[in-house]
Structures are given as structure tokens and as C-alpha cells.
Amino acid sequence: MILGIESSCDDSSVALLDIKNLKLLYHKKISQESEHSPFGGVVPELAARLHTRALPALLEEIKPKFKDIKAIAVTNEPGLSVSLIGGVSMAKALSVALNVPLIAVNHLVGHIYSLFLDCEARFPLGVLLVSGGHTMVLDIDAAGKISLLAGTSDDSFGESFDKVAKMMQLGYPGGAAVQNLAWQCKDKRRFKFTIPFLHDKRLEYSFSGLKNQVRLEIEKIKGQNLAGATDRELSNDDMADICYAFENAACEHIMDKLTKIFKERSFKRFGIVGGASANLNLRSRIERLCLENGCELLLAPLEFCSDNAAMIARAGREKYLKGGFVKHNELNINPRVKF
């Protein structure tokens, strides 16, 4: 079996995967959401401290199975440097203790393999990766080579939801909170936000402008003056109407570029991965797009959309079969590396 370790941001996770039949023998994740929620986002130093507490506890649970581990797959890129260090250090120490090889796994590649947790990978494949840190459309050829078709010039899809939620003091993470409020919208025509790059041929995403539009509307409702004083607070109806308009504009922005890409490329299969892929508005839109283009849609199970060690073990298994091991002194963290 392969041991997978994930600690790229604010989730500590460990998994055991059977190499031959891809059966997930163990998977557990300790989330830090409640600890970071008061701050409206991830506090790196706090995340690092929590990883040093959670990872040893998780590994202690599977200690009786250490003797069956053939390799250790660990996320080493990209992510928060202080978080990555925790997982990589743990993997190195355990690798020495168990005398098993190390496998370095790119976190984003791990998300791709969340589509194939219990089956062999099926390439070629188009992928939309949407998370708190990334927004990109990828093309993966038959050999598994990844090409970037579209990325973001500033905020990511998931990050914009988190920041809008922070403006309304909805806590962290903000994706589910914004989505739930959007469902409560009573006036769907009250707000209409401009969709970024709508008539631009560039295959590029940008969510900072959309986020700023939300901020301006909130300030307008509150009657906020230059000194920061406000006449009133947002009502639940205010927040619901704003969330509805924001979510639809954000999803429409994704779909605008994605539709252009579908016209240029004939995908036989297309997958949605990443924590923000759990957004039901976005999922339903992409389902329609794939149906209209005769394309098979692949979806990761909702519980494995966010960061998890199962996908890291699964991606590591591919490298294991090809002998893709890394020496201890060559396993470094790369916070900003993508592909």
C-alpha cells in the first residue's frame, strides 16, 4: 500500500491506498476551518502549528499498518510554505524509519486524480480546476502531459467567494455560505454585476474586479462615508441578493471562457476538480455544456473535492508504478510551482 500525506494549506490528511486494486484502506482529514474562521481566511503560522499536532495523531492511528507500506507520497508543491514543510518533514522522517521510498506529488495533479480514486485514469481529458488558490482550464493528452489553456490573472474563483464572505462576516471558508445565501435570494434583478473580460478574446480569468463591485454595493447599502462610518448594517435579504448576483456573475465568467475553449477543442471527456467544484451552480452549467457538446463529464465525489490525502496517494501510485521516487535531499517544497 501507499501512504499519502497532504498538508498544503489548512487540511491535515492521511490516506492508505492499495496499489493493485486502488481500494482506499484508510482516509481521514482534520480540518482547521473553525480555527481560521474568526480571521476570515487562513493564518499561515496557525496552520503550521495545527499541522504539527494533527499529522502525528493521524499517523498514530495507522501505526499497525506501517509494516505494509511500500512508499510514501507527499504533497510538496504548490501551497503555503509553512504548511508544506510540515507534511514533507513528516514524510521524510517516516521514510527513514520504515525504509521505504518517497514520492513527491504536485497538489494540483493530485486534484486531477481525485477523478480516478477507484479506477484507472482515462486520458486524454479536459479539466477545470477551481479552488481557493487556483482557477485554470487544463488539457491532458493521452500520455498524461498537462497543458494550461486558461488561468487567472489575480484572485481565484474560490478565493473570490471567501473574500465576499469576509465582507459580510460570514466566516471561512466562504463558498458554502455564499451559495446558501444565494438560494435565499428574493429579488434576482436587484443587482447585476459586470462579467469580467466578457467580450475579450483572451482566455484568462480575473475575479478582483467582480469582488470590488460587491464591495462597492455593500458600502452603498450601508451608506458608508469616507471615514468608514455606516448608517445601517446589511440585512439577510441584502446579503442573499448580493450573493445571488455575485455567484451567477462568477459562474458566468467561468462559463464564458470555457465555452470558447470547447469551441476550439473537441473534448471527449471533461472533469471538474478542486474545492470550489462543489458549487452546484457551476456544476449544473458545466453539465449542460458537456451535454450540448457530447462530452462525458467526470466529477470527483463531493467529499474528495477539497484537499485530501486520498488523491495524493492516488497520484503517487502512478509515480510508484513508473519508479518515480525522489531522494531525501532532493525533496524540497515549491510553494509557487504549478506544473
UniProtKB/Swiss-Prot annotation:
It catalyses: L-threonylcarbamoyladenylate + adenosine(37) in tRNA = N(6)-L-threonylcarbamoyladenosine(37) in tRNA + AMP + H(+). The keyword Ligase does not apply. Fe cation binds at residues 107, 111, 307. It comes from the Bacteria. It is found in: Cytoplasm. GO terms for biological process: tRNA threonylcarbamoyladenosine modification. Substrate binds at residues 129-133, 162, 175, 279. GO terms for cellular component: cytoplasm. Its cofactor is Fe(2+). Its main location: cytoplasm. One of its GO terms (molecular function) is iron ion binding. Keywords: Acyltransferase, Cytoplasm, Iron, Metal-binding, Transferase, tRNA processing. Its EC number is 2.3.1.234. Binds 1 Fe(2+) ion per subunit. It is an enzyme of class 2 (transferase). The keyword Cytoplasm applies. InterPro entries: ATPase_NBD (IPR043129), Gcp-like_dom (IPR000905), KAE1/TsaD (IPR017861), Peptidase_M22_CS (IPR017860), TsaD (IPR022450). SUPFAM superfamilies: Actin-like ATPase domain. HAMAP family: TsaD. Belongs to the KAE1 / TsaD family. Required for the formation of a threonylcarbamoyl group on adenosine at position 37 (t(6)A37) in tRNAs that read codons beginning with adenine. Is involved in the transfer of the threonylcarbamoyl moiety of threonylcarbamoyl-AMP (TC-AMP) to the N6 group of A37, together with TsaE and TsaB. TsaD likely plays a direct catalytic role in this reaction. This is tRNA N6-adenosine threonylcarbamoyltransferase. The gene is tsaD.
